[in-house]
């Protein structure tokens, strides 16, 4: 009998480091496209890019290590799925930083798993789990259904603005009126897909391209577009990394401000800086962000002028034209 153990690492694996262990056959699951691309050629483990891990991979794993995400609901969604497929001979461990929210694990999972704390070090905690009851996992029970302006919005746990449509997106949508003449749109960080779906209700002939680095967001966008009979090209991309078309009339985004709970303005700067490479001659970029974010610095660097189209108590919508590029 082979002594090689099949190990599956899943959950929030973006910053997880896997030391080389010859007697371990490791598979790592990620929802992050950048993480997937960076590790495709890693000889220490096979990388999987999907919303959830394939059933057979879970069932063939001797050990599962779940890295706790920042969203409690995302953890419940993924763990519910995993333990619904496990046998009692399989081992499952949970690892997370003190700041991730992992300390709620015993209350969150007590119906299905006996949780035991094994160790804590370097601001992280490690737990083991013994399954006492296998849940019946129903994917559709975790899809959040929202409705706004007759648009059906469907969102998977872990995707931005799961419970409702955020005010920034609403403000950005309010600047998009019927008198504008857009034929091609790039929606960066598409999330639930509500922004592109709204544009399709105003411009029925519009050609939509939706990108996100998170596969759960891409799946949410597919669900939203399908529910509203809207067509669009949806694919993973780390900002512009996977975008090949370079003639968009509009680049639109409600970009993330945090990476792993830390403020990070590099994404916004990248979107603004490189937008000119992907805009048509009459194209424009529109971005919504919090009022206190120094977005104007990037626009000043890369455009001769820009416009603040709209403001609210918390948000600003910025706009700049390709013709005004530096």
UniProtKB/Swiss-Prot annotation:
Keyword field: Cytoplasm, Methyltransferase, rRNA processing, S-adenosyl-L-methionine, Transferase
Subcellular localization(s) per the UniProt record: Cytoplasm
S-adenosyl-L-methionine as UniProt keyword: yes
GO MF term set: 16S rRNA (guanine(1207)-N(2))-methyltransferase activity
Pfam families in UniProt: MTS, MTS_N
Keyword Methyltransferase: yes
A GO CC term assigned to this protein in UniProt: cytoplasm
Subunit-level organization: Monomer.
Similarity remark: Belongs to the methyltransferase superfamily. RsmC family.
Official protein name in the record: Ribosomal RNA small subunit methyltransferase C
Native species: Buchnera aphidicola subsp. Baizongia pistaciae (strain Bp)
